[in-house]
């Protein structure tokens, strides 16, 4: 265990038996078993009624759950040593009649790419462990201003998958496990955020995505994950990969809680934001699906050839639920855009933006991608190529002017694959089986998508439906996803 900054600790080997036990005054009302799976509204109701438990009690309860379960899951990489103190202050505010909003006193988790004052922001990499972040990312300040409590930072695929290591593994945090089965795919790169929410370690988490990093782990761990339109949420203070695709996003166990988070996360505008004042819970009402025109792919076109899609039994059931709730299902053809130049463009973006971030970030062992690669070689040796993607990124030679022109053409092509069927068939949204990997094209387009649990496989692992649409269609997507979720009731709890 190393001491970093004034009174701040982090754990190199992440040994839970060494986690500091913070003292707290006696809590009059114990937090009952099962509270770990309560919704935000249920938690707020408990904390607001006479005789209910406090936020301090809830934080204590979840900290103990982390200490008990997470040595196996390895979803949490660092506890916030100020969480209990913050909870006490928020309890006092509530007692004084001051409630900041629906997230008042609610614990949240943050992916380890999001700068958090007094805590490490390392993307799971030892090379980025040093002086704690000097301030919060604006997104974190927005959440705190609404009363949310940063409970911990979450483990992730190291460097958001750009080191070239297995999903959910980082040198700092180890291998995150899927709480539904330790050998199941956990997804990446927001692995810890999804696994921890699924395991009841916190009700809410913030993930971040370039391509699939929210949607994939949310689907595989059986929780709800929203990847917003690129630019909707503030990205300052988040370790970057590509300005063309990066976005933070909320993860929770229900669509309503995701919408509450999105309200808090978009509370203030920034130069990066395309948002307007929207209450993302407004359309989450009974009969939200009635009359909604929802497209679903029955064929796809790739390289000019039309091929049929065979629905899984699980996805066929999803369509049945949607239709039973009054949705108008429209079969569509989904064109697959040409992604042949995508990897080259993305890796070139990562090289420029990661180098720029490291150069500006103070107190870290490395200041550039070249130094990062050398750090890893010095620490882990050169006998095995344990950072193939980092080396490919560092070898990129694409010039910025050529890259921007190519990006614009690529993004427009990918956007048209979503826009065309929506316009042609006057659709409110499109739904697909998560297993079709539709999230890839949605991410390249910079468009929003949300994954919702749809049941389980024969092996008991979560399945998911993926709803997506055109730019800034989040209110409609949330409404459709909520309507499906409430009718399907398909989410399952892991047998930990």
Functional labels for PLM-detected ranges:
Residues 45-52, 63-71, 81-84, 88-96, ...:
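Sec-exported extracytoplasmic/periplasmic mature domains
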């Amino acid at each position: 265990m190393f001491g970093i900054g004034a009174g701040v600790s982090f754990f190199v080997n992440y040994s839970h038996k060494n986690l500091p036990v913070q003292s707290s005054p006696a809590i009059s009302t114990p937090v009952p078993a099962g509270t770990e799976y309560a919704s935000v509204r249920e938690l707020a109701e408990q904390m607001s009624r006479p005789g209910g438990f406090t936020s301090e009690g809830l934080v204590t309860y979840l900290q103990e759950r982390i200490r008990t379960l997470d040595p196996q899951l390895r979803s949490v990489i660092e506890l916030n040593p100020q969480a209990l103190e913050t909870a006490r202050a928020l309890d006092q505010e509530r007692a004084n009649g001051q409630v900041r909003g629906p997230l008042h006193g609610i614990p949240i988790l943050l992916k380890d790419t999001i700068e958090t004052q007094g805590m490490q922001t390392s993307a799971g990499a030892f090379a980025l462990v040093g002086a704690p972040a000097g301030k919060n990312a604006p997104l974190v300040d927005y959440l705190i201003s609404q009363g949310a409590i940063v409970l911990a930072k979450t483990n992730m695929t190291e460097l958001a998958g750009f080191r070239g290591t297995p999903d959910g593994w980082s040198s700092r945090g180890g291998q995150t496990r899927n709480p539904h089965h330790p050998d199941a795919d956990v997804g990446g790169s927001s692995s810890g955020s999804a696994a921890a929410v699924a395991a009841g370690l916190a009700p809410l988490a913030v993930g971040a995505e370039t391509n699939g990093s929210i949607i994939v782990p949310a689907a595989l761990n059986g929780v709800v994950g929203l990847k917003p339109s690129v630019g909707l949420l503030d990205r300052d203070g988040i370790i970057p990969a590509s300005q063309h695709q990066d976005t933070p996003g909320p993860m929770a166990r229900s669509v309503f809680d995701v919408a509450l988070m999105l309200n808090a996360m978009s509370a203030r505008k920034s130069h990066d934001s395309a948002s307007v004042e929207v209450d993302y819970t407004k359309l989450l009402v009974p009969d939200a699906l009635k009359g909604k025109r929802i497209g679903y792919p029955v064929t796809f076109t790739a390289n000019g050839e039309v091929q049929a899609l065979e629905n899984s039994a699980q996805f066929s059931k999803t369509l049945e639920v949607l239709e039973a709730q009054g949705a108008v299902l429209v079969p569509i053809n989904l064109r697959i855009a040409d992604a042949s130049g995508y990897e080259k463009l993305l890796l070139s973006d990562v090289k420029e933006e990661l180098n720029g971030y490291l150069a500006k970030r103070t107190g870290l062992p490395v200041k550039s991608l070249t130094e990062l690669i050398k750090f890893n070689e010095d620490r882990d040796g050169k006998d095995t190529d344990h950072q193939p993607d980092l080396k490919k990124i560092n070898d990129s030679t694409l010039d910025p002017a050529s890259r921007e022109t190519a990006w614009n053409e690529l993004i427009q092509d990918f956007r048209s694959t979503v826009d065309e069927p929506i316009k042609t068939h006057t659709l409110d949204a499109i739904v697909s089986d998560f297993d079709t990997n539709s999230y890839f094209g949605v991410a390249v387009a910079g468009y929003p998508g949300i994954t919702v649990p749809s049941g389980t496989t024969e092996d008991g692992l979560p399945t998911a439906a993926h709803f997506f649409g055109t730019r800034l269609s989040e209110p409609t997507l949330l409404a459709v996803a909520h309507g499906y979720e409430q009718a399907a009731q398909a989410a399952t709890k892991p047998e930990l």
